Curated annotation (Swiss-Prot):
Acts as an anti-CsrA protein, binds CsrA and prevents it from repressing translation of its target genes, one of which is flagellin. Binds to flagellin and participates in the assembly of the flagellum. Pfam families: FliW. Keywords: Bacterial flagellum biogenesis, Chaperone, Cytoplasm, Translation regulation. PANTHER family: FLAGELLAR ASSEMBLY FACTOR FLIW. One of its GO terms (cellular component) is cytoplasm. This is Flagellar assembly factor FliW. GO terms for biological process: bacterial-type flagellum assembly; regulation of translation. Belongs to the FliW family. Its main location: cytoplasm. HAMAP family: FliW. InterPro entries: Flagellar_assembly_factor_FliW, Flagellar_assmbl_FliW_dom_sf. It is found in: Cytoplasm.
């Protein structure tokens, strides 16, 4: 199948690549089906893109590339909704907010996107532990 995206051109994918967000993503509750694909020549970022709206995609990254000891504790209800049986089947991503100035690019560490790569079910959860920032700077000034 092909998805013609606004910013990334035509992306080919298979039905088994589709990740279902039964609750949608906050702010985009009506969009339930997404694919995650790498950004060309970039190992840090990828795109989580709606296949229902070719204009909606999010730049995402692994929180572990930013904070090595990043941790989340999933409620039993999330584990059940995503049918998680093994933590090795879990992919955690965080949304990135782009800006023209490098030092203003941020990542939302408070609301990780949790994906069961085995069942292709996903959900964005909110961490209320006060440990992480919504707008965590991705780059330090002067880099």
């Amino acid at each position: 199948m092909k998805l013609e995206t606004k910013c990334h051109g035509i992306i080919e994918y298979k039905e088994e690549d589709v990740i279902e967000f039964k609750k949608g993503i906050p702010g985009f509750n009506e969009l339930k089906r997404f694919i995650n694909f790498p950004i060309e020549d970039n190992e840090v970022f990828s795109v989580l893109h709606s296949i229902e709206n070719n204009e909606i995609g999010f730049i995402v990254t692994s929180p572990f590339s930013i904070i090595k000891d990043y941790e989340i504790n999933l409620d039993d209800s999330v584990i059940e909704r995503l049918n998680i049986e093994n933590e090795k089947d879990v992919l955690v991503l965080n949304t990135v907010t782009l800006h023209s100035k490098l030092e203003n690019i941020t990542v939302n560490l408070c609301a990780p996107i949790v994906i069961n790569i085995k069942t292709k079910l996903g959900e964005q959860i909110i961490l209320n532990n006060g440990k992480y920032q919504i707008k965590h700077p991705l780059f330090k000034e002067g880099i």
